[in-house]
Design a protein with these regions (language model features):
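Sec-dependent N-terminal signal peptides
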Residues: 4-13
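Generic detection of intrinsically disordered/low-complexity segments and helix-coil linkers/edges
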Residues: 4-5, 19, 98
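Mid-length scaffold segments of soluble, non-membrane domains
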Residues: 73-124
């Protein structure tokens, strides 16, 4: 009995030394995305309609999401500036652009085999950074937005183009 108690105490004392397992990421379900993403996204001073069937995202074991959805911008001042709304609940670097937890919008300009994607804060419209999306090699289905889990591709797909991303521990 003493031996069992001593063993238990040792394991409790040693547990902070055992590194915590990194939370694994998986594709978010349609129901999860519907409960997370707004039907009307707050963009600067407007609430712009979104299209739920275009939603895509990933979620980790702690319930933190990286998710996005297409904006229906026709008739709004954002028309031509932004095409997608993005919710970030864990730090991420997309094509070299660091995004801390928050809400963002992004749009792009198309030039040949490259999309130049500009990321902006959703609440202010302030530019956070730009990144290039390149044609995805091989045959890939075209998607208005797809956020691939990091175990598969670590890629944000816009149409036939992709931007690599890295999740941050901080």
């Amino acid at each position: 009995m003493k031996h069992a108690i001593l063993s238990a105490l040792f394991l409790l004392a040693a547990s902070p030394m055992i590194p915590a397992e990194k939370p694994s990421w998986r594709q978010a379900t349609d129901a999860e995305l519907a409960s997370l993403l707004p039907a009307r996204a707050p963009v600067v001073k407007e609430h712009i309609e979104t299209e739920l069937r275009t939603a895509s995202g990933i979620v980790n074991g702690h319930g933190r999401y990286i998710a996005g959805i297409v904006l229906i911008t026709a008739g709004y001042s954002a028309d031509g500036k932004y095409s997608h709304y993005l919710v970030v609940q864990a730090p991420i670097r997309i094509g070299g652009v660091p995004l801390k937890p928050g809400e963002y919008v992004f749009g792009y300009t198309h030039s040949g085999d490259v999309l130049t994607v500009h990321f902006n804060e959703a609440s202010t419209g302030a530019l956070v950074g730009t990144a290039d999306a390149h044609l995805i090699a091989g045959s890939s289905r075209v998607a208005s937005l797809r956020i691939w889990p990091p175990g598969e591709k670590a890629l944000i797909q816009i149409g036939r183009f992709g931007i690599p991303y890295e999740l941050s521990e901080k």
